[in-house]
Amino acid sequence: MYSYTELRKEHPEFIYRGYEIEESADKVGIVYDFEIPGLASFHPTWEFPKKRGEQRCFKENGTFQKLVFSLGMVELISYWKTACPPVVKVEAGSLTEEQCEWWKDLYFNGLGEFYYTNGIQENQEDFMEIRSLGGDVEGAEQPLSREAEGFLIPVGGGKDSAVTLSLLEGEKEKNCCYIINPRGATLKTVERSGYGEDQLVTVKRTLDKNMLELNRQGYLNGHTPYSAIVAFSSTIAAY
């Protein structure tokens, strides 16, 4: 396994270069562009279904662009952790100083298992510096009205999902279930809770093969704040 300190010296920067939105009649795809110079580039993808009869153009939608940018801010930590560069350059969008500190807080407090597993002693002040180098997103803001009812319930196949579905059973007709990369356990949970296919929103997330290869080679690995991935991606799905 590579040394945390040595990796940070050898790879001082992580760059969030941008993202591309690929749109068709029935779905929206997102391809992110991350890089650790001198080590690897990463292009994870997401695929979201469009609502039936959807007429909006998401490529030109400023609100949607901000949601996509923010999901990229969550996604990047899975790739940053391979070498933990001390500087993160954000070229894909603009962040205020307060927002940079918010993201640092999310990252640091979501990496506890990662630090423990790898025997790393670190503090929130020094583990990362976020530099905002990009401009504001393009496109007019298109916020949604507040008239929508019901809940979008994330389902991971575990006890938390089953308990949530049970607690909200009385409002089942208004609710939908949300699954990232559907599999047997998640689909069974939804089915046994009495939700139909028309109440199921499924999205596809693909990890970049370069990260998986670095993990195989002994670069740093461990848990990242997955609940944040669920939260930010489900916001896009609901939008």
Where are these regions (language model features)?
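RNA-binding accessory domains that recognize and position tRNA/RNA substrates
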Residues: 1-150, 167-207, 216-220, 239
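Hydrophobic/small residue at the entry helix of a nucleotide-binding pocket
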Residues: 160
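Short, hydrophobic/aromatic alpha-helical segments in well-folded domains
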Residues: 163-167, 230-233
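Conserved adenosine/adenylate-binding substructure
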Residues: 213-239
